[in-house]
Amino acid sequence: GLSLVLLFFFFFFENMNQILGGIMATQQIEDPVKRKIAEYALITVSIWIMVVGIYFFKFPNNFSFGGVTGFSSVVSRLTGMNASDFTFAVNTGLLVLGFLFLGTDVGIKTVYSSMLMSFSLSALDRFMPMAGTITDQPMLELIFAIFLPAIGSAILFNIGASSGGTDIIAMILKAHSSMNIGTALLVVDITSVVMSFFVFGPTTGLYSSLGLMAKSLVIDGVIENINLCKCFNIICDDPDPICDFIIKDLNRSATIYKAQGAFSHHSKTVIMTTMKRSQAVRLRNYIKKVEPTAFILISNSSEIIGKGFLSN
């Protein structure tokens, strides 16, 4: 079990940029059938990332970061009610809310995600049963229990899906308020973490509190990195070849306006454009080749509203 987990970590971190690039490429696929297939492939990968963190690190250590499973553990301890029955009932109700407030497409994605996660966890429990924790370092395992599910959740949120449970409430709050996803998750999960102090003791409660706060930060950080774009302000003498490259090779557009140097009083052209990180590298290299004296300002932005970007 440990060797497979380590192999997964190596593959994931080694291919992080390609994974994030694949997420962005999914949003740009024009064919609706191919885009849908790519989205469900991403959902599958995201769920598996979450399952690894939950099964190998969260469950063996009894970490509770909120969510339906956190509430289920608390309710089961307090009332004796079967935790699985409680989880199923609450998830069913939340799925109905998802269909009502978020639309059919999100609801179908969430049903698929929930079923895949349940099946994957059951399969691991049957074929790779965990006799105990992987290491004797709870803080180390807490990091992976936070990091992997948070990455999976962030990817799901970014393509308009969720793994079910309280993620649905977070998406509803995000859709109908100004809250970001991480803050919304913190709000809906904090109650069960507070209850864990009284039910499972201060040690578990403190670990769970730390995990919950870190999870919301990781989710927002991953979403921001997925959506990260580069904004260019290019001050040049000959804008035509640069604009042709932006339009024809990068399939982007740009805005051009005239300017004047404050010191030289020479006329200049300013090109303003925005694109994905992989395209930004190509544009920067091209400008250096065709006009080495051009002055280039490059800045980051993760929230862009307009055609061709996520925040339409």
Question: Over which residues does each language-model region extend?
Answer:
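Hydrophobic alpha-helical signal peptides and transmembrane signal-/tail-anchor segments
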Residues: 2-14
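Core subunits and conserved enzymes of cellular information-processing
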Residues: 24-238
